[in-house]
């Protein structure tokens, strides 16, 4: 072989090798790029699915007919914000056995199907089908210490959570220290009054709940003294209360095991000493969870009028974090508890789940 022929063969081999390496690198870059796009789409779709499931799950208890439409609406909004088109998006309400139902559903399932476009691999396939699904479950929880014998006017909660726009921060579990006013605090106020005065002066009043160590249910009437009230605040009521799902304007018969569990008795009058001592005990316990107290949100038709002791309905529950750096002190006829509302999920879901209906729920993603 002549030197000239050898050199030509060598140059040809180098050219083939260079082209081969270039094609391999191009294919690798293309696959990496398309795989990154695929992961981005799938993560965004999963987030949209989870968002829809949690949003729909919030309605399973109070308005089950709207659970699936709400889940779809929230999932669709997330998909649009991420500029992702979907081929199919559907939510279904299920019972405990994962069978579709609209009667007392316990779960909501969301499925999303979409085609993820390819770029470098478009010559092979224009898009890749991707499917995600998720399921949120309505789960009763065991409270850390039970409900506190304090009732809050539901309208005061609604003003704070909805009118002032604080509900998303509460649902997300955003710490109070990371919030901006007015969502970073909510003062509970009680007028120091005699038992004959109107109940609930301020936005809150004392409730007569079953005290620790007591036996027997007392949904309609639990007469307690100041010391019993303080012990109940410190330890939580051992009785399980629920809430009036229909939010009826009059005393309801919404029951738990045959008892009117949504009914609670007011305790007229406010005594400053037990309030201060009870908050001090919760703050000084050494357990951060003891700073979280669960309040009953009461039918505003009764918290706005009436005197003495009477029966009213619980319309809901809210977890409240005590501000232990700013504890209650006696004032001019008023005692104030400082703190703010926090999420059940982040702070109050302690203990094991139970099939016993406590009326207090959290929404959990289980798939």
Enumerate the predicted regions with their spans.
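Generic structural signal for short, flexible, solvent-exposed coil/loop and linker residues
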Residues: 4-5, 24-27, 34, 99, ...
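Alpha-helical assembly-interface signal, strongest on the long, hydrophobic N-terminal helix that forms
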Residues: 2-73, 295
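Short secondary-structure junctions
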Residues: 76-89
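N-linked glycosylation sequons
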Residues: 65-72, 90-107, 120-122, 126-367
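Low-complexity, intrinsically disordered short peptide segments enriched in small/polar/basic residues
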Residues: 1-3, 11, 34, 81, ...
């Amino acid at each position: 072989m002549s030197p000239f022929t050898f050199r030509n063969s060598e140059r040809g081999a180098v050219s083939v090798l260079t082209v081969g390496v270039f094609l391999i690198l191009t294919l690798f870059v293309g696959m990496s790029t398309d795989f990154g796009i695929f992961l981005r789409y799938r993560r965004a779709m999963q987030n949209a699915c989870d968002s829809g499931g949690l949003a729909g799950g919030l309605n399973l208890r109070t308005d089950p007919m709207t659970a699936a439409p709400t889940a779809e609406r929230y999932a669709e909004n997330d998909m649009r914000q991420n500029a992702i088109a979907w081929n199919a998006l559907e939510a279904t309400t299920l019972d405990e056995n994962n069978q579709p139902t609209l009667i007392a559903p316990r779960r909501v399932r969301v499925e999303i199907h979409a085609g993820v476009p390819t770029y470098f691999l478009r010559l092979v396939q224009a898009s890749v089908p991707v499917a995600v699904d998720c399921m949120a479950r309505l789960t009763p929880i065991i409270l850390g210490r039970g409900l506190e014998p304090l009732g809050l006017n539901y309208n005061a909660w609604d003003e704070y959570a909805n009118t002032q726009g604080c509900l998303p921060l509460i649902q997300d579990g955003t710490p109070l220290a990371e919030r901006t006013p007015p969502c970073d605090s909510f003062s509970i106020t009680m007028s120091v009054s005699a038992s004959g005065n109107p109940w609930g002066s301020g936005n809150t009043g004392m409730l007569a709940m079953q005290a620790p160590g007591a036996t027997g249910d007392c949904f309609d009437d639990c007469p307690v003294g100041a010391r019993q009230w303080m012990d109940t605040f410190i330890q939580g009521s051992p009785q399980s209360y629920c809430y009036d799902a229909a939010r009826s304007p009059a005393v309801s018969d919404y029951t738990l095991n045959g008892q009117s569990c949504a009914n609670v008795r007011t305790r007229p009058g406010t005594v400053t000493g037990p309030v201060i001592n009870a908050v001090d005990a919760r703050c000084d316990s050494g357990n951060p969870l003891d700073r979280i107290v669960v309040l009953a949100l009461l039918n505003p038709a009764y918290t706005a009028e009436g005197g003495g002791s009477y029966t009213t309905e619980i319309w809901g529950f809210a977890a409240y974090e005590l501000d232990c750096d700013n504890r209650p002190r006696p004032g001019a006829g008023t005692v104030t508890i400082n703190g703010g509302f926090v999420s059940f999920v982040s702070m109050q879901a302690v203990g094991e789940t139970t099939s016993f209906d406590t009326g207090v729920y959290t929404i959990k993603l289980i798939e």
